[in-house]
From Swiss-Prot:
GO BP, sorted A to Z: L-tryptophan biosynthetic process
Positions annotated as active site in the UniProt record: 87, 175, 177
GO MF term (any one): anthranilate synthase activity
Primary gene name: trpG
EC number: 4.1.3.27
Cited InterPro entries: Anth_synth/Amidotransfase, AS_beta_subunit, Class_I_gatase-like, GATASE, TrpG/PapA_dom
Reaction catalyzed: chorismate + L-glutamine = anthranilate + pyruvate + L-glutamate + H(+)
Keywords in alphabetical order: Amino-acid biosynthesis, Aromatic amino acid biosynthesis, Glutamine amidotransferase, Lyase, Tryptophan biosynthesis
Pathway: Amino-acid biosynthesis; L-tryptophan biosynthesis; L-tryptophan from chorismate: step 1/5
UniProt name for this protein: Anthranilate synthase component 2
Domain Glutamine amidotransferase type-1: 2-198
UniProt subunit comment: Heterotetramer consisting of two non-identical subunits: a beta subunit (TrpG) and a large alpha subunit (TrpE).
Function: Part of a heterotetrameric complex that catalyzes the two-step biosynthesis of anthranilate, an intermediate in the biosynthesis of L-tryptophan. In the first step, the glutamine-binding beta subunit (TrpG) of anthranilate synthase (AS) provides the glutamine amidotransferase activity which generates ammonia as a substrate that, along with chorismate, is used in the second step, catalyzed by the large alpha subunit of AS (TrpE) to produce anthranilate. In the absence of TrpG, TrpE can synthesize anthranilate directly from chorismate and high concentrations of ammonia.
Length: 198
């Protein structure tokens, strides 16, 4: 399986690479290619990905230099190639498909929050109210109708994950690749299982 990670210049990117590489399918670890968000869409396509992961990163999704090729990938690749957006990856997807992203009332950096979810897709066989690591000062304030909200903070006040209704695109606001997220390997594994079955 070929996995492309679009790196939005985040310190967690290589944690994602490690988590992906630790998930063999058919006795083979995924081949992971990391492309900076300054890469071209042609470079992403040339890597012939079976799956794409859009990394976290600093900045705002409405600032082109902060997300680079991410927006092109979301529009041109994600409709057919299974894609997982993480943190900025989720914010970029919401923004690109017509939602809004704003400042959080309280920035969350290195804190955990219990997450409730729909027990499907990337959350299949994952415990309810698992602790999820959060490192973000932005939140998705309106979710486009093309997405289903699949996870929230326990009180339901903030979306923590979404899934596109028609495309193989799932996104999480939290960081599955952080050691503070106890089920991170399982979330990544469920994503890779879905990608392999696509």
């Amino acid at each position: 399986m070929n996995v492309v990670v679009v790196d939005n210049y985040d310190s967690f990117t290589y944690n994602l690479v490690e988590y992906l590489s630790a998930q063999p399918r058919d006795d083979h670890a995924p081949d992971v290619t990391v492309l900076k968000n300054t890469a071209s869409l042609a470079a992403v396509r040339a890597a012939d990905p079976d799956a794409v992961v859009i990394s976290p990163g600093p900045g705002h999704p409405d600032t082109p230099r902060d997300v680079g090729v991410t927006t092109d990938v979301l529009r041109a690749v994600s409709p057919r190639v299974p894609t997982l957006g993480v943190c900025l990856g989720m914010e970029a997807a919401v923004h690109e498909y017509g939602g809004t992203v704003g400042r959080a009332a309280e920035p969350m950096h290195g804190k955990t929050t219990p997450v409730s979810h729909d027990e499907t897709g990337i959350f299949a066989d994952i415990q309810q109210d698992f602790p999820a690591a959060r490192y973000h000062s932005l939140v998705c304030t309106s979710i486009p109708s093309c997405f289903a909200v699949t996870a929230t903070t326990r009180d339901g006040s903030l979306p923590m994950a979404i899934r596109h209704r028609d495309h193989p695109l799932a996104c999480v606001q939290f960081h599955p690749e952080s050691v503070l997220t106890g089920v991170g390997h399982d979330v990544i594994g469920n994503f890779l299982d879905a990608a392999a079955a696509h």
